[in-house]
Amino acid sequence: MLSIPIHAGKLQLANRLVMPPLATENCTDGMVTENLITHYEKRAGKIGLIICEHAYIEAKGQASKGQLRLDHKADMDGLKELVKRVHVKGQTKIVQQISHCGDLSRVVKDRTPVNDLTLDDMKRIKQAFVEAALRVKEAGFDGVEVHAAHGYLLSQFYSPLTNQREGSYGSSPENRLRFILEVIADVRKAVGADYPLLVRFGGCDYKEGGSDKKDVPHSSKLIQETGCDLLDISGGLNGFLVKGAESDTFVELSQLAKQTVDIPVLVAGGIRGKEHMNELLAQGACDLIGYGRPLMKDVSEIDLLL
């Protein structure tokens, strides 16, 4: 099953193994470096898809010092070189993830109390997502992924632990999802109907009082209906970790999403072993499998799976 091709909208993949976005901190002032390019170049060739690590869409949304940038100062020549060096290795496609960290920045020195975003702030951020997505397309990436998971800004809207708003952007799951859907809709309109659009969605906080997995089917359906070609399901409010889950961390979420969507669903997190991966695919628990941390340590892991 891993070796069977699959498509997500216009994104044609040679197999179902994906390198998910994992930050390398290899950038200098947000610029593409040779170390960054080499990191992805070494992992390209056999794997179906690489999702390049999150890039910030505006300076206020920068998560860490070594993060890639896709704001107005983006290194377009470097990004184009990255895409070219991945593509020349063979069948691997590469998608770029775009993100806003919200209040999780490790570079902002002024830790003043966090205030609710105004409607004007939200409008500015949506436009920043749009402009970043257009830069991704211009650079030649095979698609763009909107990051709405792991405690960053968009998932802060979805989580009742971080979203204390009332009105149209708070309280109910539908309202808390609204800003995410608006970003997806605006990006879809900007990049066009045929350009592959992925969404990494944090479907459950796994914390008391947080977002609940029971809402995953409905939320996933709304994300698809808004223009998503591939749902990259995940969870956990602050980073990727879920206490007590050492394997198949988010498979239960992919299974819930599969109840209502007919676009491909990608899941990562503690999924190990070729036989087990094929079992999950055959069972319909997911359509693609992310395999990240082992590939960070040892590129040859790909040869054991494909």
Spans of features found by a protein language model:
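Flavin-dependent oxidoreductase catalytic cores
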Residues: 1-306
